[in-house]
Amino acid sequence: DEVKNIVGAFYQPKMVFIDPETLHTLPRRHYINGLMEALKAGLIYDASLFALFEHGDIEKDLDTIIEKALYVKKSVVEQDEREQGLRKILNFGHTIGHAIESYYHLSEYLHGECVALGMLYFIEDEQLKQRVISVYERLGIPTHVDFDPEAVYQLLCRDKKADGDHVTIVHVPKAGTAELIETPLDEVRTILKGTQA
């Protein structure tokens, strides 16, 4: 069964090796796909990182984007190694994103594309959402995909983040900030049925 994120574990790396030059060996779609995690980091924690996507030159700013995204993850994980609270903000876009990815059998859309779609559901400020959509369009990230909302909901219920009849959803009220909101799964079902990203 092609389902994402049903188990997890915590292991810290012994070292991290970063070679931005290897990214240039990727097809453009995969290169941009990988940058969606950095865009997410900007939306949840560092508005200046989001600004690089919105106003900067991604090729020219790549080293800065990587450095800022790593700082976000390092800072968050150091404060909450076992995902008891703050670290959950790193899941922004992933709850619905993993379900969309599973719906398409982990093949038609890439992980970063699905996370990007998942983020759109919980950006509260409509102007910010439009700014994010503009970034997606410029980079070639899908802003909408067709799916059966009930099937995606059922996949979401199998995610390890779902707890009984609730799931912790990451909301972004403004660039650089995130809030964790315990949300009834039925409310997520309504969101999926009422509006697709």
Language-model features, listed with the residues they occupy:
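Short helix-capping/linker segments at secondary-structure and domain boundaries
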Residues: 43-50, 104-107, 125-131, 164, ...
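Residue-level marker of motif borders
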Residues: 14, 89, 168-169
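Solvent-exposed alpha-helices and their adjacent loops that cap or buttress functional pockets
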Residues: 7-11, 81-82, 161-163
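C-terminal charged capping/lid subdomain of soluble metabolic enzymes
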Residues: 36, 130-197
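A glycine/threonine-rich phosphate-anchoring loop and its flanking beta-alpha core
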Residues: 1-54
